């Protein structure tokens, strides 16, 4: 933070902000201008400067995790070896994560062949993973803010390692599913915490480039990973176990450096007086003024009270209700086919009813009772964030609907070898996404704007979805598959980088982890809906289409549960193989249509997205750099007009929502 911000009168406790969402904008503007050390603005200018009021209120309650990461640039210059060590440590984490993402999807196909229940297990795992990926991120983000980034890294590494141990040793489909679900928490955490730290350390003008660099290992590793998975899957009966198990060893080794170096930064910052008891600088000054620097051991009652307060700040009740409601609403799409009377089964109906009721309980809790809600009010008044959610929720919904069974469809519908199938389906898509993401990042660095690029990407993605739909009924050539993947990656890279940078630019540093996690929460839940839609269509139609072929019931069951056996059991271009291909093609048609229709909604939202100028600040709101120091005054902010519109929208939203 700046020296001016430190010298201002004692700030209010952050809880008062949460209890007063209707605070007068002019008063907020006065406080914000004072915080910036500038009182020369007239009344009109101060009202327009209310953008800083939200930022100021966020800094008032700035949590220890944010202050800790800001201390890096306050203690060490940007060219310091410690800073470069942080970058190198982040690279180790991203390489491990990229290799995981480049291989484990292929292992799952062969694991379910060994354990059975391919179609049902695939759909349930995809749905539950998407739900857990979403609801775990706000929890992990709160760990980042309340404690520290390194604490969050340690926690997710534990989940990641334990999950892969369970998966590698699984002897039943249930054990495999449990392991994958535990692993998903770790994977979601690595992705989230890395995104948060990258945004912590990079100015807006470089945010797109640095974010893309975390995905740069995907340029190389998918090709290497495909060789690894092909060798393991074809070289030994249960090679997939080795594929999963190696990450239980790699993860602790790769994540340890970033944890240790951030702990070292903490220690240096405390010695320099930037931190005290892992608290914010404001808390340190108050402790010195009040003479309470001496540490005293808490009583058992105090410890219990601290635990209760921690649970409130985590909003564990809200996260539990959210996870339970969406699980009950989405899982039936994957299991209804095996239920007696299917949709009319009392258990299926009860799941939908209970899911809807619990979702209502979640909303009531968040609006009326939660002291630290998952849906932070300051974030949800943010027009940029709401548009970003709209774009990404339908982006992931259509994308997951298309991708959940696309690998199985291409495996059966083409004559590609296992290695070439992996190259086209997995390696090409992820490599292209990384390359185009890096190019999009440099576009943002050069032009300092993102909206034109984002809209172009959304249009390209619509074309890609149309090409996926075209690739059926004999049109599924290698060229069609490749170009579908390339165009989808190009459009996705341009869209995602715009959404991420815009949403992060629209909030002060204190809200950074919250907005990243909340964007991930709702977009991943959109992905869960997409996976559930695909699972419902797949499990509801493929068995019927296979029954219309000349396969015996036993052959139908084997083809449905383990598509990998089709390549070896039914030679290419034989009558039975052609019938099977046709059954898979008919099943995918409605899935592709859903994905194509959903691709238009993000385009409409993208047209309404503001176009922030990306400069040297950490965000476009409060004029601070990555160390928390104010480097840009309110009147010099090139995004002042956008911020004024956001304030006007937020004020109207507060009145309309009655929060």
Swiss-Prot record:
Residues 42-54 have a biased composition (Basic and acidic residues). It comes from the Eukaryota. Glycans are attached at residues 38, 415, 475. Induction: Expression regulated by iron through the urbs1 transcription factor. The chain crosses the membrane at residues 79-99, 121-141, 150-170, 208-228, 245-265, 316-336, 348-368, 379-399, 424-444, 451-471, 478-498, 528-548, 590-610. One of its GO terms (biological process) is transmembrane transport. Keywords: Glycoprotein, Membrane, Transmembrane, Transmembrane helix, Virulence. Residues 1-62 are annotated as: Disordered. One of its GO terms (cellular component) is plasma membrane. InterPro entries: MFS, MFS_dom, MFS_trans_sf. PROSITE patterns: MFS. It is a multi-pass membrane protein. It is found in: Membrane. Siderophore transporter; part of the gene cluster that mediates the biosynthesis of siderophore ferrichrome A which is contributing to organismal virulence. This is Siderophore transporter fer7. The gene is fer7.
